[in-house]
Amino acid sequence: MPKTVDLPSVLMFINSCSDAELRIINDEIATVMLKSPTISEALLEHKKTSGYECPYCSGKAVKNGKNVAGHQMYRCKDCGKNFTANTCTPLQRTRKNSSTWRTFLEMLLMDATINELTGRCGISQTTAFRWRNKVFDALIELSNNMELQGTIEADETFFKDSYKGNHAVWPAARDSRSRGSSASLRGISREQICIPCLMDSDGKYVAKITNRGKINAPTLSKAFAGNITPGSVIVSDSATAYRRFSKSVGADLHQIPRGKHSVGSLNIQKINSLHSSIESRVNHVHRGVSSKYMNGYIAFTCWKQTHSGSLPELTDQLIADIVKATRVKTCIESSARPFIPVIK
């Protein structure tokens, strides 16, 4: 088994190298980086494999062409709109090269702050924030399209609603709370947002904000009916909402009684672990997240929870996943999203 070396030791070694040795190290790093697919290459490869479709109407009848600058363009024969391979993807309207994007994604996987992303990638704070939301929106789309099957663990977690942001642009719906203070109402109330999380035995997941207050069956059905394969087995706590939900999606239900942690070999430990990761990211890594953007942070946490490997491997996988997105919001659409994105 190869011996692992920690980063501080590597940095100490580099600082002790001569100029000639540093040039050799730099050439080796460049060679390794060239072997990794860039985000642009991954996007084009995905388009070639899956086929080009219109990002506006999902039409399959597409005509090739080029604009006056010689760049590849496409025109939908159904709606008549023009688009490129980057339209409605995280790369839309970006002016940076693929190496900057790769550095950005690596820093994102290391939970870098906005200021750290800005300094390392050479972009502004606004650009870093928008890029992060583009990546998160792509992961939301990936999560919403997942089909869960087999044994599915289901449970919900709650967060206080948050209107963190620029209140000069959009006013808060209530008076501000002191940082770290509790809600004005006891227990689970409309001051809290409900986030159901579902994960199957294959590591597929879906989690999002559904409603204010307690979980309910109609909202569960609207949010997750398209993600559950009929005949699956749902394992949940004793909440009554899961009974009607499981019937509506054609799944069997096994509920764990209050006060117990499992029923036979069935439990919801994966979901409980996911809840801890989401809470840690929201409250400690990012020091509070606006409910407006919460779904993106949930999707990113779920993705990290279900993927493992070295940083280059995780970056390659993240690139391969986000280029599949075809409905990523533009900056204007992103800022115009509802303050509390409940299911209606």
Q: Where are these predicted regions, by residue range?
A:
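Residue-level recognition of single "structural anchor" positions
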Residues: M1-K344
